[in-house]
């Protein structure tokens, strides 16, 4: 799992972030929600981003899916941690952690 969101601790944003936010208001479309141009544009943009992330981390295509199809976006780190912890762990599994862990790790483990 990779945590790309440092917005809570970073005051200044790169100019590219401001530009991307500005552009997002011009291309309003829900990916996968239709065949209209706005929806298709957004779908392509998301898939292109998945491809770039897969390439960045040298992910290889699997037998049944491309590397880009295995890149998953979540709303935040808490959701990502819940998916991993609740999806991989089973009752009786042993997990080593410390009291320094964030609440979003400790709660699913308790």
Where in this protein do the model-derived segments appear?
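Pyridoxal 5′-phosphate
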Residues: 1-110
């Amino acid at each position: 799992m990779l945590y790309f969101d440092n917005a809570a601790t970073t005051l200044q944003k790169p100019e590219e972030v401001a530009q991307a936010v500005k552009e997002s208001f011009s291309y309003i479309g829900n990916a996968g929600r239709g065949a209209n141009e706005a929806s298709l544009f957004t779908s392509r943009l998301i898939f292109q981003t998945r491809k770039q992330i897969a390439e960045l981390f040298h992910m290889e295509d699997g037998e049944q899916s491309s590397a880009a199809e295995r890149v998953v976006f979540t709303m935040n780190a808490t959701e990502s941690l819940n998916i991993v912890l609740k999806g991989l762990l089973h009752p009786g599994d042993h997990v080593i952690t410390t009291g320094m862990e964030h609440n979003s790790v400790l709660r699913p483990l308790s």
